[in-house]
Amino acid sequence: LAINFISLTEALMFAQLFPLMDKMGFDPKDLFEVFEDSVLKNWTSTFYTKKYMDREYKLDFALALGTKDLSYVKRMYEEYNVPAFVLDGALDFCRVALAEQEKGQPPIDMSYPCETMYHLLGMK
């Protein structure tokens, strides 16, 4: 759960950033290269930012399962009665993206929140 908390939260941060930078005029391919050439490069960043660059969200890990894992971690914080600041935002983002999933359709990928952000920014 600890690894999923870190990696999924990182994926969600990139999912939020790519559409915003695109709206501001930065080419997603250039942004991808910036991260690939930075100290932030790791397996998670490469795997997810490639999806965000291409706006292709092939199912590799279901968003519903990632949300469930993050919810388990949230309960751990609640057991100690302390806030989970970053986690709360990540869970909110996941829930907004999950609401876009149409009933009866295949599961959406953990990368789909990027597309949700594009929708929120008015970019189809």
Q: Across the structure, where does each feature detected by a protein language model lie?
A:
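Active-site/catalytic core of tyrosine-dependent DNA strand-transfer enzymes
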Residues: 120
